[in-house]
Amino acid sequence: MTSIQQRDAQSVLAAIDNLLPEIRDRAQATEDLRRLPDETVKALDDVGFFTLLQPQQWGGLQCDPALFFEATRRLASVCGSTGWVSSIVGVHNWHLALFDQRAQEEVWGEDPSTRISSSYAPMGAGVVVDGGYLVNGSWNWSSGCDHASWTFVGGPVIKDGRPVDFGSFLIPRSEYEIKDVWYVVGLRGTGSNTLVVKDVFVPRHRFLSYKAMNDHTAGGLATNSAPVYKMPWGTMHPTTISAPIVGMAYGAYAAHVEHQGKRVRAAFAGEKAKDDPFAKVRIAEAASDIDAAWRQLIGNVSDEYALLAAGKEIPFELRARARRDQVRATGRSIASIDRLFEASGATALSNEAPIQRFWRDAHAGRVHAANDPERAYVIFGNHEFGLPPGDTMV
């Protein structure tokens, strides 16, 4: 990343800071709409958010991924749904950069601002046919799909009735159906609807295997050689999920402190909450855990990127540590939000109280498969004992 790109990325962060008040004001409307408002997506486009991880050849900044995740953390601190969608849709520009140049040209050739959604869970498959794959399936949980013109869907490649590869198929909006099913308790504003694909031909250049990503043989590296595109999938994808959850924890913390500063505790003879020493203990504990979550999460991303920028390989030990700390960041954030919410009193149950929305959104984000702690901890433990990792998400 050049000094000019660094400066431009910092300018995007500054512009995002200026957007935060209006995004905060639209948080309830975003929930009610069940997807991001068009004006929010336009504002993110206008300040260059989606260019952060986009290749330079398409007008992007191909920036340090820590700056991208910092942006999503800030967005999530005022609206969980906005942070979630921006993180997921934003990282897809990094993913597309690894695809064959022909796929990049199909998506960005006429309009480099074209956005991509995804559903990576293997809820369908592609059968090998002449020149590519015949894809069928029904993929749930495609966050931000209403604002995308293409999508990635994950699944196996089937040949002679057997799976022979696994990865992502890139499909244009004209060839899949969006089913409006997103009626949920948390992350209501993400529009994470279901994508239905029926007998769609996907040419070979619009498939990318996870193996090619992991061993640095992805076709896109021939034209996009910046260090960010050599970051491990097992770091980028899970951090995309955890960064906004930590952001929600920061938002819940700010909402709690503001509320407690004005709260009079009716059950305790009119005592002001800010005069309660135990209230101060709770916020100190929460603040420490949230900061620790973020420092570990983003510190590992920065360590990996620094090695790549210096032309070095990322050791498996660091990748395993990054995965360990990623799930730990989610766990710490959820526990901190719970601690604060439980101490907020009955007024926190109001639909107008921001903390209840952060509480619901963070718990909804927690159920994402990338946040399963046991799987990540076993990877780390296996490595410590000199055993095979036992999982590919690392």
Swiss-Prot record:
Pathway: Lipid metabolism; steroid biosynthesis. One of its GO terms (molecular function) is acyl-CoA dehydrogenase activity. Induction: Induced by KstR. Its EC number is 1.14.14.12. One of its GO terms (biological process) is fatty acid beta-oxidation using acyl-CoA dehydrogenase. It is an enzyme of class 1 (oxidoreductase). The keyword rRNA-binding does not apply. CDD domains: NcnH. GO terms for cellular component: cytoplasm; plasma membrane. It comes from the Bacteria. FMN binds at residues 84, 118-120, 141-143, 263, 346-347, 368-369. Keywords: Aromatic hydrocarbons catabolism, FAD, Flavoprotein, FMN, Lipid degradation, Lipid metabolism, Monooxygenase, Oxidoreductase, Steroid metabolism. It catalyses: 3-hydroxy-9,10-secoandrosta-1,3,5(10)-triene-9,17-dione + FMNH2 + O2 = 3,4-dihydroxy-9,10-secoandrosta-1,3,5(10)-triene-9,17-dione + FMN + H2O + H(+); 3,17-dihydroxy-9,10-secoandrost-1,3,5(10)-triene-9-one + FMNH2 + O2 = 3,4,17-trihydroxy-9,10-secoandrost-1,3,5(10)-triene-9-one + FMN + H2O + H(+). Homotetramer under anaerobic conditions. HsaAB monooxygenase consists of an oxygenase component HsaA and a reductase component HsaB. Belongs to the HpaH/HsaA monooxygenase family. Catalyzes the o-hydroxylation of 3-hydroxy-9,10-secoandrosta-1,3,5(10)-triene-9,17-dione (3-HSA) to 3,4-dihydroxy-9,10-secoandrosta-1,3,5(10)-triene-9,17-dione (3,4-DHSA) in the catabolism of cholesterol. Can also use 3,17-dihydroxy-9,10-seconandrost-1,3,5(10)-triene-9-one (3,17-DHSA), but it has higher specificity for 3-HSA than for 3,17-DHSA. Can use either FADH(2) or FMNH(2) as flavin cosubstrate. Also catalyzes the o-hydroxylation of a range of p-substituted phenols to generate the corresponding catechols. This is Flavin-dependent monooxygenase, oxygenase subunit HsaA. The lineage of its organism: Bacteria, Bacillati, Actinomycetota, Actinomycetes, Mycobacteriales. The gene is hsaA.
